Amino acid sequence: MQKKFEDCVKTILEIIGENPNREGLIKTPNRVFKAYEFLASGYTQNVKDILNDALFESSNNEMVLVRDIEFYSLCEHHLLPFFGRAHVAYIPNKKVVGLSKIPRLVEVFARRLQIQEQLTEQIAQALMENVDAKGVGVVIEARHMCVEMRGIQKANSTTTTSALRGIFLKNEKTREEFFSLINSAKQVRF
């Protein structure tokens, strides 16, 4: 499979008018293979394996929010990057998930060919189903290189998507609290 991939990269280089045998490009097919192997590693990861070992009994029934989770992904339409921040909240239902697992969940879905709308939905649904939460809220803000580098060429434009489940969808006060928290000034200084 690796050789086939590398041969395709060589063909692309030739089609755009490059010489894949020149010094700067000789190792490019292998580098591109390794890059895509990493960038698409989410296909080989199982959400249940990540979350189920990190569920802990808890009486907490208040919102848990992990915000400003930086991510990058590849647009499934152009194979160009999009990147930004995800804000993920849930309300526990007798169990909490280890905090590091929420960014890992974002990473699993971001490391697949994606569109932002689908990424947002997948994160919300996976957390809702695997943690048995009372509700989940996910907001993603991202910049898309397919918008900035080609076509319309609108640099620095941002796309925002949201996905709400359970009490976040049904209860206006929960929804307001979520949006207020993700929009509040950052209090932690590093």
From Swiss-Prot:
Residues that coordinate or bind Zn(2+): C75, H78, C146
Gene name, please? folE
Task: State the coiled-coil residue ranges.
Answer: none
**What are the GO MF terms of this UniProt record?**
GTP binding; GTP cyclohydrolase I activity; zinc ion binding
Keyword list (alphabetical) reads: GTP-binding, Hydrolase, Metal-binding, Nucleotide-binding, One-carbon metabolism, Zinc
The pathway entry for this protein reads as: Cofactor biosynthesis; 7,8-dihydroneopterin triphosphate biosynthesis; 7,8-dihydroneopterin triphosphate from GTP: step 1/1
Q: What are its E.C. numbers?
A: 3.5.4.16
Q: What is this protein called?
A: GTP cyclohydrolase 1
What PROSITE patterns does the record point to? GTP_CYCLOHYDROL_1_1 (PS00859)
State the similarity comment.
Belongs to the GTP cyclohydrolase I family.
User: What GO cellular component entries does it have?
Assistant: cytoplasm
Mind telling me which SUPFAM superfamilies this protein's record contains? Tetrahydrobiopterin biosynthesis enzymes-like
Subunit arrangement?
A: Toroid-shaped homodecamer, composed of two pentamers of five dimers.
One GO term (biological process): tetrahydrofolate biosynthetic process
Swiss-Prot/TrEMBL catalytic activity: GTP + H2O = 7,8-dihydroneopterin 3'-triphosphate + formate + H(+)
User: By its UniProt entry, which InterPro entries does this protein fall under?
Assistant: GTP-CH-I_C/QueF, GTP-CH-I_N, GTP_CycHdrlase_I, GTP_CycHdrlase_I_CS, GTP_CycHdrlase_I_dom
